[in-house]
């Protein structure tokens, strides 16, 4: 908004200083993807361990796929839902959009007759049903990790994702979906056409199995292992400091 545009430029330098000071006080960094680990290395000059977030695995029985594409998430500018709307409007493909946000009116204005907006009031069960029935899931945004592509894969649904950010670590091209190279409606449209032309017989079971790499059980195990290891490192550091202090006294 206009107030943010007026105030923020003068505060950015102070915020960068605060951010650097805060980062220097961090003992250990955990990144939610290798994409973010690289950014931590670039901006903070620090190494980090990668532990992927978790996703509830959709264990519902598989159903017949229907002839529509799906996108789920908040309707904000950086999600780039506009690319999915434009691509499917251009191709005359049915697209179901689940979510709400400030971009709703803008998206509806550019949408053709094949675009359906379901809003953000659906139950979890209803959303899972759309995940199960969708032909493919469209993910045009660039995100740190991106949980919705994993949710789609847990339903056995392939994902067509922009080939940057966390989606490059969760979507396997040719096995659980495709990447498209440019963050444009034309590039996404070309990816949709390729997906339909190739006619790859995706295995719902294999796609869901891949999503288990991001399960709640895996996350809990890795966090516990990480904390145990770091606690041992910390205790060893205390022991080393204690020995050093004794030697200094002698």
Q: Where do the language-model regions lie?
A:
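Nucleotide-activated donor-binding/catalytic signature segment of Leloir-type glycosyltransferases, i.e.
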Residues: 105-125
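Conserved acidic donor-binding segment of nucleotide-sugar-dependent glycosyltransferases
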Residues: 117, 173-174, 178-185, 193-200
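A charged, aromatic-enriched C-terminal amphipathic alpha-helix characteristic of glycosyltransferases
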Residues: 183, 201-248
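Short alpha-helical donor nucleotide-sugar binding micro-motif in glycosyltransferases
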Residues: 129-134, 223
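Conserved donor-binding/catalytic core segment of Leloir-type glycosyltransferases
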Residues: 55, 61-98
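Short hydrophobic beta-strand element within catalytic cores of glycosyltransferases
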Residues: 158-162, 171
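Acidic donor-binding loop of glycosyltransferase active sites
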Residues: 132-144, 157
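Donor nucleotide-sugar binding/catalytic pocket of nucleotide-sugar-dependent glycosyltransferases
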Residues: 8-60
